[in-house]
Regions:
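Extracellular/periplasmic carbohydrate-active domains that bind, remodel
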Residues: 1-141
Length: 141
C-alpha cells in the first residue's frame, strides 16, 4: 500500500509538501483498507503532480478502492476540501477489482484537482459514493 500525503502527521512512505513524479505500477493489493489514495491537509500549501497509478488490482478492500481527498486535518477528514495543495496531472489507469460490500469503490473530494487521465478503471463490490465533490473532468465517482 502506498499513500501520498502532504500534511504534517502520519507514518507514510512519501511525506513532503511537494510530491511530484511518482509512478505506482503493476501491483496487486489484497485485504487492505485502501488501495489508490492521495490525501492532502486542510488549509496547507504545496502540490501533488505527475502521479501515475497503472495496472493496479485490488481484492477484498475494506474502505476505499480509489480515494482522493483534500480535506485532512489532525488525522481525520473534515468533509470540506481546500485548494492549497492542488492535485494535478494524475493518471489512474487500469485500477480494477473488488471492495467489500461495506466499502466504497471510489471517493473523490477535491477543491483544486485538474488535468487527470482516468481510463479503464473498474472498482466494484462496494458502495457508490454520493458525497463526491470537485471531480475533475474525465474522472468518475
Amino acid at each position: 500500500m502506498i499513500y501520498l500525503r502532504t500534511s504534517d502527521k502520519g507514518n507514510y512512505r512519501i511525506f513532503q509538501h511537494v510530491v511530484k513524479t511518482v509512478p505506482i505500477l503493476h501491483s496487486a493489493i489484497s485485504s487492505s483498507d485502501n488501495v489508490v489514495r492521495i490525501k492532502t491537509g486542510s488549509g496547507k500549501t504545496g502540490s501533488v503532480s505527475d502521479v501515475k497509478y497503472d495496472g493496479i488490482t485490488l481484492t477484498n478492500i475494506a474502505k476505499y478502492g480509489i480515494v482522493i481527498e483534500q480535506d485532512y486535518e489532525n488525522g481525520s477528514p473534515t468533509g470540506v476540501p481546500t485548494s492549497g495543495v492542488p492535485i494535478t496531472d494524475v493518471t489512474i489507469n487500469k485500477v480494477t477489482g473488488t471492495a467489500k460490500s461495506s466499502g466504497t469503490n471510489v471517493y473523490i473530494l477535491c477543491a483544486s484537482c485538474k488535468n487527470w487521465t482516468w481510463t479503464n478503471n473498474k472498482a466494484t463490490g462496494g458502495k457508490k459514493s454520493d458525497k463526491c465533490k470537485g471531480v475533475p473532468t474525465g474522472a468518475s465517482c
